[in-house]
A protein has these predicted regions:
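Amphipathic alpha-helical packing elements
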Residues: 2-45
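Long, leucine/valine-rich, helix-dominated scaffolding and oligomerization segments
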Residues: 2-4, 42-43, 48-220
Length: 220
């Protein structure tokens, strides 16, 4: 990669980074702000069962570009995985859910965070379909006072995700070395099972746990 090409690529990534977190936090940049209770409004690919309930949602996105030249092509898929954070106060040897916990000068509230995900897929001569997965998980962070006494904890939960990247390459009748590249990203995450860790219910905040959020592509 030449210096000019590398510079262009880094500039594109910087722009994509800004887009990736658009709507993650809205001014005045506080989790308890009313405006921050309605977030993640663009590039959201819901699982198929959600789209069946609400046709205004989408489970796939399609991109088509004209490629000039014979070089190799890679597709980088980027999105956010929702991470639901709950707050628990310690009482004796047990922890109980609360809406807010103050520890020293910090206030901790229930909030939807996000984990950045990125996958790079090479494009074959004719294209291909690749099915990828993102693991779920549960992490615990203890909150202590200056003396080291545990006052509470944060519990962060993520749902597993499954999605497919389908590429297709066509070579139109042309005197030039051009190709038509189409890329489709499908959210194939199944409905939540009995052991699902995140919230349930027929509402968008619950659905977002199984969505690809701020989904977009970088082509090189």
């Amino acid at each position: 990669m030449t210096g000019a090409t590398a510079s262009t690529w880094e500039a594109a990534r910087a722009l994509a980074d800004a887009v990736l977190y658009e709507g993650y936090l809205l001014y005045p940049y506080r989790p308890d702000s009313v405006k921050n209770q309605v977030r993640f409004q663009w590039g959201v690919l819901m699982p198929p069962d959600v789209v069946a309930q609400d046709p205004s949602e989408s489970s796939a996105q399609h991109t088509e570009v004209l490629v000039d030249g014979r070089g190799d092509i890679t597709v980088t898929v980027r999105f956010l995985q929702l991470q639901h954070r709950t707050v628990e106060r310690r009482t004796g040897q047990r922890f109980h859910p609360v809406d807010r916990l103050d520890v020293c000068d910090a206030a901790y509230t229930v909030f939807d965070e996000a984990v950045q995900c990125e996958f790079t897929v090479p494009v074959g001569d004719e294209g291909d379909e690749v099915v990828l997965a993102v693991e779920g998980g549960r992490d615990v962070e203890h909150l202590s006072d200056p003396d080291g006494d545990v006052l509470g904890r944060l519990v962060r939960v993520r749902e597993p995700l499954s999605f497919a990247v389908t590429t297709r390459v066509e070579r139109p009748d042309s005197p030039y070395a051009v190709r038509v590249l189409s890329v489709r990203v499908d959210n194939r995450t199944p409905p939540p099972g009995p052991d699902s860790r995140t919230r349930r219910g027929p509402a968008r905040p619950a659905w977002l746990g199984r969505a690809l959020i701020a989904d977009h592509l970088l082509l090189r």
